[in-house]
């Protein structure tokens, strides 16, 4: 049965959340954009469950939600434009596609040697990463072909008891999904225009639409 917990966490609820994270279970949680579905990014068990829940093909690796602590452990880059984008828009609704550290578990990249990463401004997400001491899988909370959930109620209706915990009580600040920038092309390429506009990004570095 799915557990519903409100944020900010009370002490006993925080213990429940910590336990669920450590047991490699699946959570639905609010971000500054839409609701996310995730759990321990290093756990193949969690990834496999989320692929099954979302009915998503396994050749599409999940984006990760991180904090700056995890960025250099997960990704490799040597380009000041990436640093400029990070300084300008993180934490916030910008996802960057970067080269991955070759030592990462294979399920994170599906042999693509790349990662999509975002440092969310959501206090909920940042607290979950802190409690688990690992980055989170951070895919949108919807089954393939279904609308993306933007509330705890929508998550409950769409997923029933397929997720272990739903966190509610945090108001999103953006009405769009995150903007995705591929930093592996020249010039960088915008794969999805979302909460951060092409114009805003072009103020920092040249982007191909």
Predicted features by range, described:
Residues 1-209:
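Active-site-adjacent structural elements in enzyme catalytic cores
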